[in-house]
């Protein structure tokens, strides 16, 4: 479905994209057209030019699904501890030809330092051009004890600072910043009307994401006024360890 036009790939099919009845599992968007975290993960993975961690080899790869060749790119891998402190940074120059996957030998393994506090750590990836413009990013929550993420439960609650702009009657632009010294994990944005009902469907430029200390992200939201029942909606912000707040 996504890779069928590639010379070296046989195609990829999602099973399944949506549920035919209300369900908590097996869907990228649910019965009511709400996009799940899986939707945003799949969309990230399908970027035309993409940086990723190969879970099997633990190497970092640059995937180019376009027909263009990119020269003098810089791939950066940051290892962070559970508190979001950077403990190691590695970079690698890379050329990416069209319809190719390049493994970065200099970033072959995670090489987790022994001074990581506990088991949980993060990997933050960035692919930039020769002018340092960001082309792709990625983020992974991992553990030295594979699959054991229980240490995340020790993270304290944090507040996320936000500013809201309404450039149009059916759109909002949110700028979110983590001003705390602790990561804000799995931030979820949920558009609602004054009576507390969800607005669906909604187009979020991003959702279900993490913000490290000091990190900022801009999210654009669009909807149809008919789906908001002609009301002025607001955004409910929640997260794994994020204090609930309302953005108007």
What positions do the PLM features span?
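Eukaryote-biased activation of long, low-complexity terminal tails and linkers
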Residues: 244-246
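Carbohydrate-binding surfaces of carbohydrate-active enzymes
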Residues: 1-206, 212-221, 230, 234
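Short beta-strand-to-loop capping motifs
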Residues: 223-225
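Conserved recognition-core residues within compact binding domains
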Residues: 240
